[in-house]
């Protein structure tokens, strides 16, 4: 089994455990997703990000 370092979103501490040993919050994997030039969902993810942030092309 490969261990990945995890980070607590509440207190910001790093650990290898599923729950934070300090505050008890569920931890998240601290590594970003793997990059692929042939990303099949990249277009949709970028479109959603533009919509959520309110940036991008203006509709005429």
Curated annotation (Swiss-Prot):
This is Ribosome biogenesis protein Nop10. InterPro entries: H/ACA_rnp_Nop10, H/ACA_rnp_Nop10_sf, Nop10_arc-typ. Keywords: Ribonucleoprotein, Ribosome biogenesis, rRNA processing. The gene is nop10. Involved in ribosome biogenesis; more specifically in 18S rRNA pseudouridylation and in cleavage of pre-rRNA. Belongs to the NOP10 family. It comes from Pyrococcus abyssi (strain GE5 / Orsay). SUPFAM superfamilies: Nop10-like SnoRNP. It comes from the Archaea. One of its GO terms (cellular component) is ribonucleoprotein complex. The keyword Ribonucleoprotein applies. The keyword rRNA processing applies. NCBIfam families: PRK13130.1.
